[in-house]
């Protein structure tokens, strides 16, 4: 590889780091904040941000920058090839209508969960969740479902690379406590997270498995903690959620069989 090739690869890596600096928790940032989040020089970040603005992938008011919906184009090819969001969407829509609560599907990407399908009912979170929204896996019900299926070596690597920071006063930040919770998820087949990602938000998630039995995604239902108690989550939200996950799995398996036949 020539020196120019190395430079091009590094340039792409830095540009992607700038894009990843924006998230559902940090949708609008100044140049200084992006530089701090990425560890890149301010001059480098400035060039990338202005390039993103010029190409329509970001906007700015002169001080603050934010990504535009055009960035979704970067992931559409992957999502289309994945097929899973299209399969899951009608099931999420039906579940959301039945429960009058929001339902989502996520996959694990690095240390985050990424939303790939969603049926929104009442807005509970202060952050507007859309396709492509990312949250730290350790603090979400879907994230813990996905983490619970990782081989031990991969889980250890995740924990070594991830700072378990308190997002709310309820967030579990102990590695040992998180590991025990993941064992519980494996045993019971679902996960409830109570106000760890945002105060007032309670959610329950269960896995979506491929035909090989491995977890390929997680599906959840979220509700306002003041309106839906823990017992009600188990008794009223979990059974239809599990039925939805099973329906997605059946459709996913059918689609896979058609593609291979």
Please annotate each region the language model reported.
Residues 88-95, 159-205, 251:
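Short, basic/aromatic recognition patches
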Residues 1-86, 93, 246, 250-254:
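N-terminal helix-turn-helix
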Residues 8-12, 68, 81, 85, ...:
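Short, structured helix-loop boundary elements
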Residues 181, 216-261:
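Juxtadomain coupling helices with adjacent low-complexity linkers
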